[in-house]
Amino acid sequence: MALPTELRQALRELAAHTEGIDLPVYQAFERDPLEPIIGLGDTDAPLCFFGRDPGREEVRHGEPFIGSGGQIVRRVLYRHLHGAEMPDFEAGRALGRHYFWINTVPYKPIGNKAWSMAVKRRFQPLMRQLLIDSWHGRHIITLGREAFLWFAIGQPREARQRLEAFWQREDRFTANLDIDLQDAQGHARTFTLHPLPHPSPLNQTWFKRFPALLEARLRQLDASR
């Protein structure tokens, strides 16, 4: 599905007044630095992947979750769906339409450092609206602490504390948590978060375990349907 016109324009206007977008990378690939990188997939996709922010390869292709971390996710998904190894880049890319892909901020930051809380707060109402209005699913696999705790932004104190406490649990990568989101118009929905670590080689504690953790999540979700 296409990004709703009003939402796309609102994101572009917000990006135009946001410092820290990695302009040289966008220029190197002749990409518009105001164009949000969001992989909407099917509105009825049963599963959403929620990450931190796009990287260099995401800018190159204009799609989220297509770089090294995203390739790990896609390889596990392909193997789970087809029982075979992903044959090539395009096969992984084709998986995109079967899922909903979104980040805390849909623009690449300079140096691939996480966006500040101020920037995440600025974009949060629009990304929240996208989740509530443009996707009909419930289950969200969050990748990393930044993505998981995005769901605490703008929440009542009790909900924030519940999210923060959940992240401290030893079983956080096998358990799940329901969270309510409400947009500016008062439309509310309940989502179920299934957190996983960020699939980055820099995250040595969890990097090697990530494929097995994601496969376990996918099996859990298959069993719950």
Residue ranges and their predicted role:
Residues 2-173, 179-224:
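A polyanion-binding, active-site-adjacent surface
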